[in-house]
């Protein structure tokens, strides 16, 4: 008998492997994957391109009237999800260190956060969605049937991001740069006033450092999903 679709909320710290896990889980079970981090990264890129970030501060007064001009969409190309900002493929650019260093500043702006949450809730209203981010289980989809919270040490997470960047041919930053970035983002994400990163009371905590490979982490998530569905 075909089970009714559910929503899966995956939260966690930066570079914890949650997006890779969420993406693969969605593909495995035939659900839609929503990369909320890419949405905030796109807004950060927009701000950088328009000179709205100076000395670690966002010019909110200038940004707010421009928010309606920011159109973010996703397309599947060659089996991969690509992020578009106002019709332009920005998938690679939003993963760079400059955007990484500024995305938490942008996500902390209440008006930006509210606009993104509205869009994300609209995407999840018909179920069958796997969504990952910082506040999916606590704010965006508080009624999600499955909630996971993924994290591990800053050093393990930084090495993972470093290896990803090297694999793409990006040699512009050192491992120490990325460790510093990860720790800074942890601090900003957990202490921000607007919807700080925290584990939902009913979320299952996943230590991604205990998995030898990303494939092991994905296999665990897929198995967990199927066990949950069988128990419904």
Q: Could you describe each region identified by the protein language model?
A:
Residues 10:
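Hydrophobic anchor at the beta1->P-loop junction of P-loop NTPases
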Residues 13:
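P-loop (Walker A) phosphate-binding loop of NTP-binding proteins
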Residues 16:
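ATP-binding Walker
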Residues 19:
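Walker A/P-loop
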Residues 28-95:
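N-terminal phosphate/diphosphate-binding loop that engages ATP/GTP or pyrophosphate donors
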Residues 85-91, 100, 159-171, 187-232:
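NTP-dependent small-molecule kinase module
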Residues 91-168:
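ATP-dependent NMP and nucleoside kinases share a basic, alpha-helical "lid"
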């Amino acid at each position: 008998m075909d089970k009714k679709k559910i929503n899966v909320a995956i939260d966690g710290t930066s570079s914890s492997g949650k997006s890779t896990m969420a993406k693969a889980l969605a593909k495995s079970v035939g659900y839609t994957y929503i990369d909320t981090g890419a949405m905030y990264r796109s807004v950060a890129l927009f701000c950088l391109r328009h000179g709205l970030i100076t000395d670690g501060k966002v010019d909110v007064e200038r940004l707010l009237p421009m928010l309606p001009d920011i159109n973010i969409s996703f397309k599947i190309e060659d089996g991969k999800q690509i992020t578009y900002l106002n019709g332009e493929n920005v998938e690679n650019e939003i993963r760079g260190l400059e955007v990484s260093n500024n995305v938490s500043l942008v996500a902390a702006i209440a008006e930006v956060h509210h606009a993104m949450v509205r869009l994300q809730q609209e995407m999840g209203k018909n179920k069958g969605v796997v969504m990952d981010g910082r506040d999916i289980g606590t704010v965006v989809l508080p009624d999600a049937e499955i909630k996971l919270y993924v994290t591990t040490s800053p050093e393990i997470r930084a090495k993972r991001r470093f290896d990803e960047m090297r694999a793409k041919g990006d040699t512009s930053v050192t491992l120490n740069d990325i460790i510093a970035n990860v720790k800074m983002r942890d601090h900003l994400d957990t202490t921000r006033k607007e919807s700080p990163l925290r584990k939902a009371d009913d979320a299952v905590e996943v230590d991604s450092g205990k998995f030898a490979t990303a494939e092991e982490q994905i296999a665990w998530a897929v198995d967990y999903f199927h066990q949950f569905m069988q128990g419904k």
